[in-house]
């Protein structure tokens, strides 16, 4: 028997030689992550390990137990500064899932989902997570559970590439223990092979497919073949050793009973009793006793007068007590159908119930036990555990489940979820308040917006006298716009309240609460009882950004709290003003292509020398390079227009190829044409050559909820198809003075509030504009107009389609009839009421344009009156009005409406004019102080309104007659 056994171990040694050599080349480095471990890894060591460029593979091993259906984050790496995630592994017991979250190099979180895992079932589990290709190639993740690989995912973004470089920036957090939960082991392993790491959990991996190789050279095809042979060989060795043990035991007992081996022989009158047989001519032999251990191990031995007597074989064995052989209980099928039965010596064990079933562990000894105790596996009803999204149909099947469509009354799918069906056209499905407008969004979602003169969340709306989107009284809802307006009769969409006394600054006589009324206070919004003012400008030291330099404009270009008048680096680009070729525009590179001493970043003619930067027409193009040749009339001269013959005032060029989207056949340059085959592109602005569309709704997966991928969802994006415009913002604006010369020149004083959504003009000034820098094609523009004084009765309004100071549309409102006090160059008479004018001035800013704007009517080569409110009613002091403008320059459509409270008081109807084919937005004032433009909103919109078609039909019918 020694020769076969020796040969077996010799063969085993030879087979293990390659494996032993490989193991010697890559010894695993193990770091314990548990708080209680004496060798716990210091968090400061984590960052150098994980960002080591030579490390292309790592392992995380853990042993834990979670209560049934519970969820827990087993381990994670986080930013010490803002607690954002770098790496996190979470078990979601109720969903039978595990999720790996990690930070990609673009700063976004990537999710890897492992499905159909029973990790939270009250049992102890061993988990091994293997990450490969950390620094080279496409990443991959393998998950091993209880020594079996359960999932592998490849072609993933690399992990740890976005990890902070500072060692102190990484924080390790481990399992937060709850009652009946335990975390026995949590280790980080680097280097070494998968087999070596698995052995740390007493796992000898059995896999149905070759292990994934890595780029480190740990394994090769030859080694994998050897490992496969080694698996087979070890199984054979195990069976051989078990058989040899049985044979050795049998031989020992046979020799003990053999008559030829000595003077004694035994015969057994009964199966369990040995009696000596004495030959006739021989002397009486000695009687054998129990002290010679004649019985099988564990069998009771009893000495009798005639010899020894062995008891029955132990449970799980069969024989005469001297020789006992293991019983194979698996032949009696004690395990659930399909579950592997493992025969033990003695006894048997059943593997865990199949995926989709649950049941207790099954283990026993003996034929009787195997016959009378069968493993019970009960189907798991995944539909009770939230396997499908809420409010969807879930169909439970034996060992599995299937998710169906949304339940009746709900819409959506398994990707987006099932939400209660809402429909603006069906009164029973319309969730909005009776005082709200119901809007159907691109994805079929419904949004509720309180109507004019009402405020709230859209589902609940309350009265809003000043039309600033805040209700007069508190509403029973949680949205910001449900809070009570802190200035009931003065629009203040930002609800600013410097002294936090519950009264908004817009209506608080002492806004800073220092006991000094605003009119006498040199710091209206800053508490300063002493009113100290070192430089004698109009701002006290407490709020003056240049305490020792007179600067009434308080201009602070770089927003560093130091006014431009006393800041030696106004734009904060690190270059002193005296050396900076763009003092108010950051340009650390100081590039100056035309060598005129003005940097390209602020040069109105970057390729033509113009050191004086003269721009007479205020179109942001210097006179030296301004041709005023604009073939399509969109406000951009042909030499700089990215679509010279196609109207596109916005100049959007998504793929930055120099061709505007309006004339580009492939806006995102992904090889899929926008409109023609093999298009149309289901994500026109985001590259997606594969055109994935999981729910077949015609919108690609990558741009499903954010069409332009500007990180602002379409529902709140003011321009969902323009990544450069996301929110209404007039904080950056251009001032345009329309009468720049005069003896009593007073320019407007503009104050911007509420993050660019509210503008206030405080001076009784000459005509002027505050114009935003964003240009639009089609646009909807709305806002609240309010004159917060009882002084004066002149013009206020807004502009659109601004191309230069001689070309724009203006909507202006005069309170009373009045003749302009300067009759030169002509007598101008203003009538009360709302007027819509097209300005196309040959002279530009000056007395001709000034008087033409004042005059109600057409003026040659200056202004055309497109529409006037026939009511001839002027605006009222301290009353709020809401305007809505629609402009579609591609067809010349213009319509403007005015509301007083919730009542429509003026409507221009459809007006057609193509003088300006798009442009910028802004506000207008002429000799009127204390004007508020509040709750401003603009939205890109090229959709032609339905009433345009009706207008065309009526006009054609008129022509036919």
From Swiss-Prot:
Q: Known InterPro entries for this protein?
A: ConA-like_dom_sf, EGF-like_Ca-bd_dom, EGF-like_dom, EGF_Ca-bd_CS, Thrombospondin_3-like_rpt, Thrombospondin_3_rpt, Thrombospondin_C, TSP/COMP_coiled-coil
Q: Where is the composition biased (Acidic residues)?
A: 660-671
Residues annotated as glycosylated = 612, 941
Give every Laminin G-like domain span: 24-192
Which Cys residues form disulphide pairs? Answer: 290-301, 295-310, 313-324, 330-341, 335-350, 353-377, 383-394, 388-403, 406-418, 424-438, 432-448, 450-461, 477-482, 487-507, 523-543, 546-566, 582-602, 605-625, 643-663, 683-703, 719-940
GO BP, sorted A to Z: behavioral response to pain; cell adhesion; positive regulation of cell division; regulation of tissue remodeling; response to endoplasmic reticulum stress; response to unfolded protein; tissue remodeling
Compartment annotation? Endoplasmic reticulum; Sarcoplasmic reticulum; Secreted; Secreted, Extracellular space
State the protein's name.
Answer: Thrombospondin-4
Q: Which organism is it from?
A: Bos taurus
Q: Which gene encodes it?
A: THBS4
